[in-house]
Amino acid sequence: MRRAVLSLSVALMAAALLAVARLESQDATESKQTATGIVYHDANGNGKLDAGEKPLSGIRVSNGVEITKTDSDGRYQIGVTDDTIVFVVKPSGWRTPLDENNSPVFYYNHKPQGSPPLKYKGVAPTGELPKSIDFPLYPQDEPEQFKAILFGDPQPRDQKEVDYIAHDVIEELVGTDASFGVTLGDIVFDDLNMFEAQARSIALLGIPWYNVIGNHDINYDAANDRMSDETFERHFGPAYYSFDHGKVHFVVLDDIEWYIPDGSGKGRYRGGLGKEQIEFVKNDLALVPDEQLVVLMMHIPLVDVEDRQELYRVIEKRPLCISISGHTHHHEHRFITKADGWMGAEPHHHIINVTVSGSWWSGASDDRSIPHTMCADGTPNGYSIIRFDGSDYSLELKAAGRAADFQMNIHAPEVVSAADSSKTDVFVNVFNGSSRSKVEMRVNDGEWVPMTQTIQNDPAFELIVETEGKLTGKPWRDLPKPKASTHLWKLPLPSGLAAGSHLIDIRSTDMFGQKSSGRRIVRIVEGELSPKAD
């Protein structure tokens, strides 16, 4: 990571000051190094710049802070230190090379001495700065209409859970027409040796796959934040970067700050970006037209990032900007306003994406021996598909292993006393719903009636937790405690329902105009219910 965090006791302060002075002197020397190279059309696909291959002008290249453009000869120059990743900002209509796991290779990691000793292997020594760091690009068709797949927190602990992911989501996505995919952090669950197994599985989709760093993807034995992404860098390159696809500009952010509190000797993480990364975003967006949609992708939700106000100042004047995260293992559309310090003309749309792992692969197993792992807000585990059309976008939630039209869960008792029908609420969890959704209910062929949005625990999830909690000798991990859902609606049944079976219909229209529906049958009886009637 590009932020430096130094934690020392008072007794070591004098030594620290001397060390800092030496580091500053070293940085001053290192900053005089200049990387140079050519960005070119690799016509024969061999990954090498050959005679006659066309240099590409106007292509952006970055060192993680500064951004320069290639000249008419395709050449760039940019400053580097002994811990710099030089990378190309993929332009629209071009692709970068892909490795054997379909991970984009758009960078050169310059680390002459390699990573420090860590539990999980970092970057091997790269030696002296090459005379020319060249970046091959390949032309590809990128229409204004395209879609991408978003994975929140797959978070496998081991190979068994990598297999869960393979069977639960990868198999149904093979053959996708998505242009690329992104994992929004927590690629794995602390064991960084699982990066490779997870990447191999996702590679079967056959599309480029980008990665965001999460708090479970870092080196916990790192001495500071700057060294906490060494293993991530070895596998995936820079922890923050940007690229264009179609008419959209994507910015991947590293908002995991690793620090060691004074005197504690034990590291921890918090949401943070740091000055260098914010400077990169500022420099990056200065080269992006206002009419181009910008999509920020991160792990920790934006509202939980400590220096988010600095980022707000950079993006809030842009008319077209959204952000997407994971981390919290629920699904939510958040609209950031002045209540959180946002000063833009319109609220900022931030999506907290559903997680592939749901509730960390917990709960009873289904008929495939995969935990149902429902999120604590009642959202099924799964992923999102984000669609773009120029500067317009829409988001669809896809529940793992379910039909695409499974977009809601209706909770109502099996049986209700006729006398209590008007006092009995029907709840519907519209998984991708928000405060901008319209949700209505009717019973039988009655009138459609608007439902009321309510921020509370999903009673359906509460019932599952209660039911599974009573079991003994469970071979699975318990579900987490319920958390309030932001996409829950309720409405009481109408009065006067006759004894018999009645059909509840629900219809919903979300903020993107996407429609979904569901139904449930409830039985009405005369008289009092027995204690076990429902």
Predicted regions and their residues:
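Short, acidic Ser/Thr/Gly-rich low-complexity loop/linker segments typical of extracellular
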Residues: 49, 55, 62-79
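Acidic, glycine-anchored loop motifs typical of Ca2+
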Residues: 43-53, 428
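A short, solvent-exposed loop/turn motif at the edges and junctions
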Residues: 63, 85-121
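Binuclear metal-dependent phosphoesterase catalytic core
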Residues: 341-433, 437-440, 492-495, 503-518, ...
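Extended active-site neighborhood of metal-dependent phosphoesterases/phosphodiesterases
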Residues: 104-114, 119-125, 193-290, 307-324, ...
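N-terminal active-site segment of His-dependent metallophosphoesterases
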Residues: 30, 34, 116-196, 283, ...
